[in-house]
From Swiss-Prot:
Function in brief: Involved in allosteric regulation of aspartate carbamoyltransferase.
Cofactor binding comment, as recorded: Binds 1 zinc ion per subunit.
GO annotations of cellular component type: aspartate carbamoyltransferase complex
Gene Ontology molecular-function annotations: metal ion binding
PANTHER family: ASPARTATE CARBAMOYLTRANSFERASE REGULATORY CHAIN
Binding site for Zn(2+): 113, 118, 143, 146
Record keywords: Metal-binding, Pyrimidine biosynthesis, Zinc
One Pfam family it belongs to: PyrI
Claim: DNA damage is one of the keywords in the record: no
Record's protein name: Aspartate carbamoyltransferase regulatory chain
GO terms (BP aspect): 'de novo' pyrimidine nucleobase biosynthetic process; pyrimidine nucleotide biosynthetic process
Family membership: Belongs to the PyrI family.
């Protein structure tokens, strides 16, 4: 096939009238974002998911949710698995607000410690607590009680 015969193909996702677009999600994390947002498969909302879409910086995921704006707690959880994500609020088909997620230096009650012997996993009324660091691509959590580190599959340990 000659270069003249090649066609540029685009992946097109219909724009949303009102809602949220979460862009620049780390490739492969879109389904964890849906888990964080607790969107059931039986939802009447239109949800569009792009996984491993080409990007200037490699690959990314994108999630579009019609008719819903995220709360602060949801955005904070998304930041743990997608530290470079942007949250775009769409109103009347236009971006009305655009924010970059921010990772807090400490989180409480958001992630379960992976150490089964940690005090936060006992029957005691102790809330999980982690120190958070990030290098831009990877988030690292250190339990404040047992100092166990979580850096892989953080989405699997969200409460």
């Amino acid at each position: 096939m000659s270069s003249d015969d090649q066609h540029i193909r685009e992946i097109r996702v219909h724009p949303i009238e009102n809602g949220t677009v979460i862009d620049h999600i780390n490739a492969g994390q879109a389904l964890n974002v849906l888990k964080i947002l607790n969107i059931p498969t039986s939802s009447s909302r239109v949800v569009s998911v792009l996984i491993n879409a080409p990007s200037v910086h490699g690959r990314k995921d994108v999630v579009k949710i019609e008719g819903r704006e995220l709360n602060v707690e949801e955005v904070d959880k998304i930041a743990l698995i997608a530290p470079n994500a942007t949250i775009n609020i769409i109103r009347d088909f236009e971006v009305s607000d655009k924010d970059i997620v921010h990772i807090h230096s400490q989180i409480e009650g958001v992630v379960r410690c992976i150490n089964p012997n940690c005090i936060s996993n006992s029957n005691e009324p102790v809330t999980s607590k982690f120190a958070v660091s990030s290098n831009g691509q990877r988030t690292i959590l250190r339990c404040s009680y047992c100092e166990r580190i979580i850096s892989d599959d953080i989405g699997e340990h969200l409460l």
